[in-house]
């Protein structure tokens, strides 16, 4: 027990230990593959999941079960071995003195405020703006979400990551089925799963939010193992790409984030978040661009996902048929165009609602991050 407490304290105090969190991803992949193989074996390969019942044809030689068990076991073994070796090397590493930690905290301070007005007297109204950071400095600060070391902020961030994973997992379980496409087939999708990721960027930083995006689909498969590992892989890649597209377009390309100002009234500082007219227009254009771009990417992922689940990508002879109708496959160029247009429109509406939700709570999210010292 004492060794575990010492290891946990070292993981909290050493900033390089965050790389160990990346091992959670292959760990979850290995566990979910094993559980998926168990479910597939116990149900004899037949799992009813709406209109996708035909995707679960029983293999007579149980080749799929063997592959799933072997791959999952190998990934799980190497992940646990890597984690144990990393923890062993971490405990053998030289300890950092408390004086060095205090000195690092004092030298890595937040940028100071600069007064816009030259002279002001008691009762005057003056506006303070924060010093602009370069792209490299801003990206580093957003990625690690830490301007200075603090046990309290690290504890808050750890708790928030757990809460965000739970919220994202709960919302990913809400699936909207029965979206009928023009040729008669229907698809289902998750409507709220990426909304939490947009909010989490300003709470726990880009690195922790990326971990949430990579981990949640495998937790979903762990709880709801009637999906395929391919669908979890699709949602993992899609959520990760959507998150980074949102970050670079919203915070760097359009610079549409809310502006934080500090005013001095009667010789007393007063901070507030302001959406100027320029900021509102940039928010509007960023909403349109991000929504349509992310909608197209998710629709394109659905298109390739059908080939990975239902057929062999390398063989053009394996086509996807809907409702038993001939010439209604997704090899035909016109059907591909209609499919991408339909899915892009549906997913774009989804991301528009998620972006509007983010805009409505943006100020509250920034206030929470400032209050708990997360930035």
From Swiss-Prot:
The chain crosses the membrane at residues 21-41, 66-86, 160-180, 203-223, 234-254, 289-309, 338-358. It is found in: Cell membrane. Disruption phenotype: Probably essential, it was not disrupted in a global transposon mutagenesis study. Keywords: Cell membrane, Membrane, Transmembrane, Transmembrane helix. InterPro entries: MPN160_family. One of its GO terms (cellular component) is plasma membrane. It is a multi-pass membrane protein. It comes from the Bacteria. This is Uncharacterized protein MG147. It comes from Mycoplasma genitalium (strain ATCC 33530 / DSM 19775 / NCTC 10195 / G37).
């Amino acid at each position: 027990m004492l060794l575990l407490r010492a290891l946990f304290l070292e993981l909290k105090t050493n900033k390089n230990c965050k790389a160990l969190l990346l091992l959670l991803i292959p760990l979850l992949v290995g566990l979910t593959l094993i559980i998926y193989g168990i479910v597939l074996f116990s149900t004899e390969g037949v799992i009813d999941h709406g209109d996708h019942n035909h995707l679960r044809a029983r293999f007579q030689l149980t080749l799929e079960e063997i592959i799933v068990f072997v791959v999952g076991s190998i990934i799980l073994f190497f992940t646990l071995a890597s984690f144990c070796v990393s923890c062993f090397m971490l405990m053998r590493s030289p300890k950092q003195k408390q004086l060095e930690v205090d000195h690092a905290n004092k030298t890595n301070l937040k940028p100071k405020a600069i007064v816009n007005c030259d002279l002001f007297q008691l009762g005057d109204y003056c506006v303070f703006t924060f010093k602009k950071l370069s792209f490299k400095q801003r990206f580093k600060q957003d990625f690690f979400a830490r301007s200075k070391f603090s046990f309290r902020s690290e504890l808050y961030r750890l708790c928030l990551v757990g809460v965000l994973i739970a919220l994202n997992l709960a919302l990913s379980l809400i699936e909207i089925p029965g979206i009928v496409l023009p040729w008669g087939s229907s698809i289902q999708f998750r409507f709220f799963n990426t909304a939490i990721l947009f909010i989490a960027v300003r709470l726990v930083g880009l690195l922790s939010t990326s971990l949430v995006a990579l981990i949640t689909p495998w937790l979903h498969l762990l709880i709801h193992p009637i999906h395929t590992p391919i669908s979890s892989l699709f949602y993992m890649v899609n959520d990760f790409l959507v998150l980074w597209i949102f970050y670079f377009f919203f915070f760097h390309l359009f610079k549409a984030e809310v502006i934080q100002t500090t005013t001095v009234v009667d010789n007393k500082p007063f901070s507030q978040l302001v959406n100027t007219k320029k900021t509102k227009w940039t928010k509007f254009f960023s909403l349109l661009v991000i929504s349509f771009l992310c909608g197209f990417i998710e629709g394109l992922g659905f298109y390739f996902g059908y080939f990975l689940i239902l057929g062999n990508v390398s063989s053009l002879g394996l086509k996807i048929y809907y409702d038993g109708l001939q010439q209604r496959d997704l090899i035909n160029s016109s059907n591909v165009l209609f499919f991408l247009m339909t899915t892009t429109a549906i997913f774009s509406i989804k991301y528009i609602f998620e972006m509007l939700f983010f805009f409505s709570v943006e100020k509250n999210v920034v206030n929470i991050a400032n209050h708990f010292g997360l930035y």
